[in-house]
């Protein structure tokens, strides 16, 4: 297990410092599996761990890299104590539906944090040449340079879902000469700026720092989502969302997309006191968390409790009832 110091991620956007907990700390150490360290989940997890660790001493939280698709199974089987994921993956993991091969019924929701949007960055020059949708990417007769993001993440899963729906695969696209990279958001941001890639995808909240940086170094725009792809994503648990105009250079108007709701999961074996204290401490330090990511500025107990039909952890139920977020 690789644990990352929360403060490193908060300060630098991505974390490289690695600490291995000693045996004496193992009982007290709890891990949060995030997404890529510089992405939305990474920053949310790092901020949460940081304020929690500073305001109590019974449990210490650390963050570890993961992915929205992989984290439910990882948490369920003890690979991490908590994990960020998305509502569609949490539901399908509990039920044992694709992309999961078996059910993970011990998963419990702690809190919903945000609604993410599927960001499809593309070089403006490539967009103007006629590659404006996923359909254009799949049917292209010339090799393309595409960043598909780390395998196991919700972003990579979304891309694979679309490609298969269009009758292709990453392997078929690679066979025509495509350059494909499966790297994190920070690396993809740098690569699209320098022209090493022309397409970069990311399920994230707004604003997203990697996307902002990418647009500062190259003229970028967003691919269009066809009605065909919107129907596909709707059938797989995604909901309509809007990427606000004015956040990313060169994109003054709102962009219609599809997205997922990001949430924190644990299992039914997790201490109710730990879950309760995480939520209570987080809300008590919401101004501090708001400086880590703007998502926290809009994060309320009512929003956190809105996990749909997913089962809430008893510690979360206790907190949400106490503050009047649920009955």
Outline where the language-model segments fall.
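Bacterial N-terminal signal peptides that target proteins for export
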Residues: 1-9
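C-terminal lobe and pocket-closing loops
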Residues: 221-277, 312, 319, 323
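Bilobed "Venus flytrap"/periplasmic-binding protein-like clamshell domains
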Residues: 29-55, 59-62, 116-190, 194, ...
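A structural signal for short loop-to-beta-strand junctions that line the ligand-binding cleft
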Residues: 101-119, 247-256
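Pocket-flanking alpha-helical
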Residues: 44-50, 62-103, 186-192, 204-215, ...
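An extracytoplasmic/periplasmic, membrane-proximal ligand-sensing/linker region
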Residues: 194, 199, 204-207, 211-217, ...
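C-terminal segment of classical bacterial N-terminal signal peptides
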Residues: 14-24
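Extracytoplasmic
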Residues: 27, 56-58, 67-70, 77, ...
């Amino acid at each position: 297990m690789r644990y990352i110091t929360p403060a490193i991620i908060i300060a630098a956007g991505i974390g490289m410092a690695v600490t291995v907990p000693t045996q004496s700390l193992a009982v007290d150490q709890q891990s949060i599996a995030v997404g890529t360290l510089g992405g939305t989940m990474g920053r949310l997890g790092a901020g949460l761990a940081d304020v929690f660790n500073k305001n109590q001493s019974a449990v210490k939280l650390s963050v570890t890299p993961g992915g929205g698709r992989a984290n439910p199974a990882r948490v369920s089987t003890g690979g991490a104590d908590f994990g960020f994921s998305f509502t569609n993956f949490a539901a399908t993991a509990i039920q044992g539906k694709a992309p999961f091969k078996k059910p993970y019924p011990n998963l419990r929701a702690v809190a919903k944090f945000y609604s993410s949007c599927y960001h499809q960055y593309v070089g403006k020059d490539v967009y103007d040449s006629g590659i404006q949708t996923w359909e254009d990417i799949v049917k292209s007769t010339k090799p393309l340079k595409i960043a598909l993001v780390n395998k196991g993440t919700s972003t990579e899963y979304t891309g694979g879902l679309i490609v298969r729906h269009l009758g292709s695969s990453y392997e078929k696209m690679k066979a025509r000469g495509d350059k494909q990279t499966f790297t994190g958001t920070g690396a993809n941001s740098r690569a699209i700026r320098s022209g090493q890639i022309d397409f970069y995808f990311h399920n994230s909240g707004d604003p997203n720092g990697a996307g902002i940086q990418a647009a500062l170094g190259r003229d970028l725009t967003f691919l269009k989502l066809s009605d065909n792809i919107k129907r596909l994503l709707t059938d797989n648990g995604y909901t309509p969302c809007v990427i606000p105009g004015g956040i990313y250079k060169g994109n003054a108007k709102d962009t219609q997309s599809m997205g997922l709701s990001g949430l924190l999961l644990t299992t039914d074996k997790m201490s109710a006191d730990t879950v309760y204290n995480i939520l209570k401490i987080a809300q008590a330090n919401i101004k501090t968390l708001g400086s880590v990511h703007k998502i926290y500025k809009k994060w309320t107990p009512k929003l956190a409790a809105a996990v749909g039909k997913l089962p809430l952890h008893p510690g979360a139920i206790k907190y949400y009832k106490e503050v009047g977020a649920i009955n």
